[in-house]
């Protein structure tokens, strides 16, 4: 009988760099349901979204005026501009996409998730089975910013052309 890691590899095409960090089938199903695909971002394996609208100006949501003292600046940033500055892109509601450490180790690959995929529908307990995190949050803050900048650098010339023309 195959172990679940091998089954997930065969089903998704994800490499060992991703699959070896998975704790459970339930965790893998969250990423599969989100339709994440494997890429290398800044030299690190990651599961990335293919459904982010990079041209969208999702910071223009009215509710964000209360959250950002400098909202006037951010309203003119599309999602590609945001990640170029090291900030997460935003979904159509204006909520930022979140980065999750697959397997909850400091050197784990990242998965790009919506808040709902990350924390809602019981996913928090599935994705964070150990209540005591080993993630250095200060280091992670810097990694998140670099990750999004590296994600921008990974755009092809054709993608950049589609976003800005």
PLM regions and their residue ranges:
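Nuclease and nuclease-like effector domains acting on nucleic acids or nucleotide cofactors
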Residues: 1-97, 103-165
């Amino acid at each position: 009988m195959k172990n679940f890691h091998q089954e997930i590899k065969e089903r998704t095409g994800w490499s060992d760099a991703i699959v070896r960090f998975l704790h459970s089938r339930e965790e893998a199903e969250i990423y599969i349901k989100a339709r994440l695909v494997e890429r290398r971002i800044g030299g690190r394996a990651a599961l990335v979204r293919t459904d982010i609208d990079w041209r969208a100006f999702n910071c223009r949501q009215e509710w964000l005026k209360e959250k950002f003292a400098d909202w006037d600046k951010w309203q003119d940033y599309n999602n590609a501009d945001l990640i170029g500055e090291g900030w997460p892109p935003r979904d159509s509601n204006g909520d930022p996409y979140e980065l999750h450490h697959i397997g909850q180790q400091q050197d784990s690959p990242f998965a790009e998730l919506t808040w709902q995929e990350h924390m809602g529908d019981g996913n928090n307990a599935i994705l964070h089975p150990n209540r005591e995190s080993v993630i250095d949050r200060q280091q992670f803050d810097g990694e998140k910013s670099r990750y999004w900048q590296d994600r921008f650098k990974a755009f092809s010339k054709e993608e950049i052309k589609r976003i800005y023309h």
